[in-house]
Swiss-Prot record:
Its main location: secreted. May play an immunomodulatory role in frog skin in response to microbial pathogens, since it increases the production of the pro-inflammatory cytokines TNF-alpha, IL-1 beta, IL-12, and IL-23 by mouse peritoneal macrophages and has no effect on the production of the anti-inflammatory cytokine IL-10. It is not known whether stimulation of cytokine production arises from a non-specific interaction of the peptide with the macrophage membrane or from interaction with a specific receptor. It comes from Leptodactylus laticeps. One of its GO terms (cellular component) is other organism cell membrane. One of its GO terms (biological process) is innate immune response. This is Plasticin-L1.
Length: 25
């Protein structure tokens, strides 16, 4: 997700691969 991806960018992981890429995708 966008929100989860952006927040996860700080943590270094998240939905869709994590990080900024995860936020965009």
């Amino acid at each position: 997700g966008l929100v989860n991806g952006l927040l996860s960018s700080v943590l270094g992981g998240g939905q869709g691969g994590g990080g900024l890429l995860g936020g965009i995708l």
